[in-house]
Amino acid sequence: MTIKNEEQQQQTNKLKYPKNLLSSGLDGEGNTYINIEDLWKKELEGKDNKMEDKWYKSADEYWKGVEATVDGMLGGLAQVSPIDVVASKVFIQDFIKGTDSRPPINLNLALDCGAGIGRVAKEFLLPIGFKNVDLVEQNKLFLDKAKSDNFKDDNRVENYYAVGLQDFTFEKKYDCIWIQWVIGHLHDLDFIEFLKKCMDSLTPNGIICIKDNCAKKRFIMDKEDNSVSRTEDHLKYLFDQAGCKLLKSMVQPNFPKELFPVLMFALERK
């Protein structure tokens, strides 16, 4: 484990969470955490950062057991994919067309984060007009599936980065960095650091878009895939800590009622 990660672990526990984020949370087994600080203390603190290693390894092991299909990527809910894509297209239109206060983004290169088998790139990012897309996904088998199936005869995907977001090193500038259903696998400080790296890797007028589950009243820890669903206020706090300006937010419509609410956020540097 690097010195940087040692420092990050210390800082994670020193985030000054506002009082409204210090309510209790739950895991999928019904266990209660006193607050978000208690979650990170139990999940991350340990000698030589071994607990932080375990945090990411547990998620990695979970996804190694998931089928490399759309149904696998969406937890057995492949039927929501078209609904998801339609809403994402609506959400990003203001940024593609531009507004009185903001010129349109360029459509040269997008980054699909937590890309899986490339569903978002294939069904959304490329169809809306991006000339090229890079994929970053920790599971190499998913990327191999993307290469052999989704993009077999499509050279618009330039790079396939097999690495977790917490370890990803940006090599390019992007017009749009799209981060969907993956931030729950990053602990708070790594999420903040990743957003900072994203901002440093945007082209002029580029945007970061986040689409993910939002817990309604308090955070929920999923012990099965080792991820945390944060409240909207929690996410906005982390955006602020990273130095991000919120440009737009939108609730995903028409999803099954039994699912977590899904929100979309567009960000730029403050």
Swiss-Prot record:
List of residues binding S-adenosyl-L-methionine: G114, R119, E137, Q138, N139, L165, Q166, Q180
Gene Ontology biological-process entries: methylation
InterPro entries: MeTrfase_NTM1 (IPR008576), SAM-dependent_MTases_sf (IPR029063)
GO molecular function terms listed in the Swiss-Prot or TrEMBL record: methyltransferase activity; N-terminal protein N-methyltransferase activity
Family: Belongs to the methyltransferase superfamily. NTM1 family.
CC annotations in GO: cytoplasm
Keyword Lyase attributed: no
EC number: 2.1.1.244
Domain of life: Eukaryota
A family per Pfam: Methyltransf_PK
Catalytic activity: N-terminal L-alanyl-L-prolyl-L-lysyl-[protein] + 3 S-adenosyl-L-methionine = N-terminal N,N,N-trimethyl-L-alanyl-L-prolyl-L-lysyl-[protein] + 3 S-adenosyl-L-homocysteine + 3 H(+); N-terminal L-seryl-L-prolyl-L-lysyl-[protein] + 3 S-adenosyl-L-methionine = N-terminal N,N,N-trimethyl-L-seryl-L-prolyl-L-lysyl-[protein] + 3 S-adenosyl-L-homocysteine + 3 H(+); N-terminal L-prolyl-L-prolyl-L-lysyl-[protein] + 2 S-adenosyl-L-methionine = N-terminal N,N-dimethyl-L-prolyl-L-prolyl-L-lysyl-[protein] + 2 S-adenosyl-L-homocysteine + 2 H(+)
Its job: Alpha-N-methyltransferase that methylates the N-terminus of target proteins containing the N-terminal motif [Ala/Pro/Ser]-Pro-Lys when the initiator Met is cleaved. Specifically catalyzes mono-, di- or tri-methylation of exposed alpha-amino group of Ala or Ser residue in the [Ala/Ser]-Pro-Lys motif and mono- or di-methylation of Pro in the Pro-Pro-Lys motif.
Protein keywords: Methyltransferase, S-adenosyl-L-methionine, Transferase
Protein name: Alpha N-terminal protein methyltransferase 1
